[in-house]
Amino acid sequence: MKPLLRSHETQYYSLYPDTLNGLHNVFRTIGNSVQSDTVRRLNLGYLDGDNRRGNLAGGLELLRDATTPNASRMNITRPLDTSTSGATAMIMQSLRTDVAENITLLTGDSRATISRQVTLTDFCFPDAEMPGLIILSIRHPLDINSEALYATPAGRDPRVMETVWYELSELAAVSVNRVNGSGVRPSLVSLSFLIAARASDYADKCGAEALRAHVISNYGRRRMEEKLDRFGICLITMLRCRVFPHRHFQLLGGLISWISQREIASITAVVRGPQESIKTEQTAMPRSSVYVPACAYIDFDKDIRVIHEERSSSSLYLVFVYTQKFGRETVRIYVMRSRLGEWAFREGLGYMYSGVRSNNAITGVDGLIVPHGANVNMEFPLTKTLDLRNRDRRLGIAARSRDLNKADWKVDLRGRPTKESCMYAAYCRLGHLDESSVPVKKFERCGSLDIPVIWIPGVIWNIGTWIECY
């Protein structure tokens, strides 16, 4: 929330420039009293010394008279204190109570941004879910097929991508050609559907299979199990063709309300701000909290044993984990809670999935075309280059002429490890939690099934960009 506070602070001071100038004068007056003594301390008040005492009094009077919309509410009402700690407390209290209050009026703690989108309900059926479910948007399959044409490495067929999407289109309203590419399409996918499509890849088999059974029985579609299988095959084929799913799935937000009719729905989600700030229009659940299937939730800091505080401010991350062993690819999606920042979280992922990371570096090139033969330049011709330089130096050939005799090294990178073949995870920031938010595991009744879920109260949506891990 600090970047958000800074942005609104800048907005506030742009509206009231006199306040900023006044505060600058206060700190400039205080800064003039800094003495270059042995302890280098800040002398804010003195019992003696009219000049220094006058500077402090003038600074406090200027702070008291700062022109703000709520200047009359500033908490400098008692006589000026002559002690250093008293003057410091007065300044800090004034800055916190007045400036922070005006910034809060501009931001609004309960203000949030929502998005409404119309979609077909093939991959997201809101009637079977509860408010608070994480919703993702998916790009058009034609974009995925187009990227596969140039992203697929040598030795793998990019046309398989078009084939698996065509097979999925037999069960879902997925456009696979330019003729019927217009109109409403299944542009949203729920986190439950995404996890159920690859339920066999999760360590928590019971929770994943219970979620899959919930999607099959409650989504109200024919041949739902086969649709999940084919969607899961599409994810694996995307990974095999190096069209990574996270590049085509974007976070939309948390489900709030919806209007559905037959196979189409208008879905509203919170994309920025507190999840609980928007009403759900349901009497049974007027406010909603974000929830995640238990099989896909990880308390990151607890698992890697780096921070042991249960109550502290933290962030939520959406993480895609890839295993790229040819013929045994896996795609797992997790929601992880961590107190670490975005870049420190990346190092933690490398520690947690060190096995997956090393296996991808070794087996990520299986099934690719590797050049063979005597003409393959596997190593840099260092010896030949040194021999040419020594010979030219003995013969007295000029440096410009020696450039023509440099060794020509043309390496063939087909079948060599690249950052795409070594990619083991990708994540993006989902939002923030304060220290009072503690996730709770519960069993929720969905139709005739009990599904283990993790309720995460107090989520403040602040979606970031994708960061890839190699």
Curated annotation (Swiss-Prot):
UniProt keyword annotations, A-Z: Capsid protein, Host nucleus, Virion
GO cellular component: host cell nucleus; viral capsid
GO biological process terms held by the UniProt record: viral capsid assembly
Molecular function terms, GO-annotated: DNA binding
InterPro entries per the UniProt record, alphabetical: Herpes_1 (IPR004999)
Keyword tRNA-binding part of the UniProt annotation: no
Compartment(s) where it occurs, according to its Swiss-Prot or TrEMBL record: Virion; Host nucleus
The keyword Cytoplasm appears for this protein: no
One Pfam family named in its UniProt record: Herpes_VP19C
Oligomer and partners: Interacts with TRX2, MCP and capsid vertex component 2/CVC2.
Function comment: Structural component of the T=16 icosahedral capsid. The capsid is composed of pentamers and hexamers of major capsid protein/MCP, which are linked together by heterotrimers called triplexes. These triplexes are formed by a single molecule of triplex protein 1/TRX1 and two copies of triplex protein 2/TRX2. Additionally, TRX1 is required for efficient transport of TRX2 to the nucleus, which is the site of capsid assembly.
Similarity comment text for this entry: Belongs to the herpesviridae TRX1 protein family.
The name this protein goes by in its record: Triplex capsid protein 1
Gene: TRX1
